[in-house]
Amino acid sequence: MNTLKVAGKFLDQPMLVAKFHNAVPTILTAGAAAYTTKEIAHAPQEKRKKAAIRIGTTMAFTVASALAAPKITNKLFKDADEIPKSIKELKKDATGLVEDFLKKNQVDEKSKQLLEKAKENILKYKEVKTLFKNFENNKNGKELLNKLIPDPENIDSKEIFSEIGRLSVFGLIPVLGGITGGIIGDKLTTDKWKKKIPDKIKEGSYQYLANIFLCNIGAGGALAIMEKLNIRSKGHRAIGMIGGIIATGVIGGSTIANLIGNKIINPLFEHGHKHKKEHLFDERKPEPLDIGLHTDDIATVAVMSGLKWIEPALPMMYSVSGYRAGIGYRNGKPHSDKN
């Protein structure tokens, strides 16, 4: 087994994925608190109280919605047997598999020690590599390892659009949460809060369309084509999905998002308002962080490729888009900074 496959197996250990999943709320909350503290400290002394309320409210709603997104999407899209198991359940399953295998098969002492460890603990990279190497010519051993650490499953044509929908709803929830928190934060700190709503919705649509939805469409569309052509290689499918993401999200995403903003969102908010010239017709241009946000598209490829380890990180990735929507970011300073 080559290095990449061993790395994939190591990262896809159910107990490792479950522990990472359980740690995400703490990691995301701590990161959000640190960023909020930094932003408040950088605000002018006389504006720090309002900045704390505005930024804190926006961040709180963003983080809360991002952490709620997995539960919501699981209820909407996943069957009961697909919902991740608890660590206790995983240990029970692993113990049963290992004990049943050892009763029926003779193995070397080193492999036995590692299997005993695998009942209730996460194996190290070298230990995973050792087990797969030792069981390379052992059919029953291979079957056991694939039960302990299941292989990624290619999504079939029937599941593609459901997965696009699930990931798109997953990404939408933090964006809506960020916008809601941003509006509440503005309402608590300024009488001009209504004037700031258009930029939040425009940035929300930009983040969602350019950095989330259209990228999912690109990846899913490419995957559907490869499924129709019966391309089963995970490497070729990954390359195809990345190509789809580049075409729809990275290249065309900002253009499409700005077009929708100018043709739909602007007319909706400009009617009867006095703030026609305040950024409403400015195009939102991609910045380095926007390009960086496309790292979550690698997560999209990984999830659609059946890898388990990346999914727990999605709330952290999508919360960046949610927060930017909440502050009504435009190129330059966020609109929320202006009073």
Whereabouts are the PLM-identified features?
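Glycine-rich, hydrophobic membrane-spanning regions of integral membrane proteins that mediate transport
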Residues: M1-N339
